[in-house]
Amino acid sequence: LVDLREAIGNGLTVQPIANMVNHETNELFFDNLEIPASSLIGEEGKGFRYILDGLNAERTLIAAECIGDGRWFIEKASAYARDRVVFGRPIGQNQGVQFPIAKAHIEVEAADLMRWRACEQYDRGENAGASANMAKYLAAEASWAAANACLQTHGGFGFANEYDVERKFRETRLYQVAPISTNLI
């Protein structure tokens, strides 16, 4: 455990990374940073195992965030499909509009089941690595599918700031590559 007030300038440098999403991101540079033995958390030599276990929790939390995003996109798309009238009827009466939203809903709910499985394993102290990775993968894919369905449902209006779709679209894309890329799971 390191007190940043003491470490910054004494071997630790924090460099912000500018980005377009609502997540503060920084690079950390360690250069001969001395850490007292009293700062040790857990058993010496087991730090990597602790990190991996922490990543399981992180991936499960990211899965939950993706599921929330996916549900937001589905609700936004569904509401717009009900309200937007073209040629005298709501666009949601067209199967071509309905099916991508319904498919995204199915994918989000399936990802949520895997997320709960990972949470339960983690809470019981079991190895949740595989379930956490599957939950993160499925949820990232599901939220991205929901984002695409939502943007497609809104058409050109999906890029208008007033609908918030374009902002969330950019944010949910992040989880295809972070905290671990879906093609590395």
Task: Give the predicted meaning of each segment.
Residues L1, T13, E27-F29, E34, ...:
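Structured core elements
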Residues L52-D53, H154-I185:
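Glycine-rich phosphate/cofactor-binding loops in nucleotide/flavin-utilizing enzymes
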Residues T25, G45, A57, G96, ...:
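Active-site lining segments that contact anionic ligands and/or coordinate catalytic metals
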Residues E65, G96-F99, I106, M134:
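Alpha-helical coiled-coil segments
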Residues E43-E44, Q93, R124, N161:
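Residue-level signature of the cytosolic catalytic core of signaling kinases
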Residues L1-A79, R89, P179-I185:
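FAD-binding core of flavoproteins
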